[in-house]
From Swiss-Prot:
The lineage of its organism: Bacteria, Pseudomonadati, Pseudomonadota, Gammaproteobacteria, Enterobacterales. Belongs to the 'phage' integrase family. It comes from the Bacteria. Keywords: DNA integration, DNA recombination, Fimbrium biogenesis, Transcription, Transcription regulation. One of its GO terms (cellular component) is Holliday junction resolvase complex. PANTHER family: PHAGE INTEGRASE-RELATED, TYPE 1 FIMBRIAE REGULATORY PROTEIN FIMB-RELATED. Residues 2-184 form the Tyr recombinase domain. GO terms for biological process: chromosome segregation; DNA integration; DNA recombination; resolution of DNA recombination intermediates. InterPro entries: DNA_brk_join_enz (IPR011010), Integrase-like_cat_sf (IPR013762), Integrase_catalytic (IPR002104), Tyrosine_recombinase_XerCD (IPR050090). SUPFAM superfamilies: DNA breaking-rejoining enzymes (SSF56349). Coiled coil: none annotated. The active site is at residues 41, 66, 136, 139, 162, 171. PROSITE patterns: TYR_RECOMBINASE. This is Type 1 fimbriae regulatory protein FimE. It comes from Escherichia coli (strain K12).
Length: 198
């Protein structure tokens, strides 16, 4: 077996719990939640601005990079709550009014890739994940979780903004659950055919 290169849903939950009580807990929780739920690359996440969100309608506009398809995703209730909680806290941060970027540092500038990497790595350590955690693992965790929930490859491709389905197949190809019941279904078909022959 090769070393796992993604996080499980339980590990992501543990990471969010690990960060939520720290000094920057509201920001870090929101950052991890949105990265995971929307399968965002770190650059896409850090490029999010308030104009990309419609909290009333429950939508988030994701501008995909690497020639990916930009998409509009629904924002679930817990995501809206996390954004609202972070936005309230963010308003008290020095220099927060200088930028529309959602994720900022304590100094009021847009959060850097290095800072986001450190937040996610440290959350993984605190949560006791089985592998060293980095931001792209949250994107992979999203793809694998969607496959586990039975989403088909094309839908996952659209959701993650992949232009080429080759990049998406990894999520469904390794999902053993998709084969569950395959023989049972085939046996039912065979039994039906036998009855029709009689």
């Amino acid at each position: 077996m090769s070393k796992r290169r993604y996080l499980t849903g339980k590990e992501v939950q543990a990471m969010m719990q690990a960060v939520c009580y720290g000094a920057t807990g509201a920001r870090d929780y929101c950052l991890i939640l949105l990265a995971y739920r929307h399968g965002m690359r770190i650059s896409e996440l850090l490029d999010l601005h308030y104009q990309d969100l419609d909290l009333n309608e429950g939508r988030i506009n994701i501008r995909r990079l690497k020639n990916g398809f930009s998409t509009v995703h629904p924002l679930r209730f817990d995501e809206r709550e996390a954004v609202e909680r972070w936005t309230q806290e963010r308003a008290n941060w020095k220099g927060a009014d200088r930028t529309d970027a959602i994720f900022i540092s304590r100094r009021g500038s847009r959060l850097s890739r290095q800072q986001a990497y450190r937040i996610i790595r440290d959350a993984g350590i605190e949560a006791g994940t089985v592998t060293q955690t980095h931001p792209h693992m949250l994107r992979h965790a999203c793809g694998y979780e969607l496959a586990e929930r039975g989403a088909d490859t094309r839908l996952i491709q659209d959701y993650l903004g992949h232009r080429n389905i080759r990049h998406t197949v990894r999520y469904t190809a390794s999902n053993a659950a998709r084969f569950a019941g395959l023989w049972e279904r085939n046996n039912l078909i065979n039994e039906k055919l036998k009855r029709e022959e009689v």
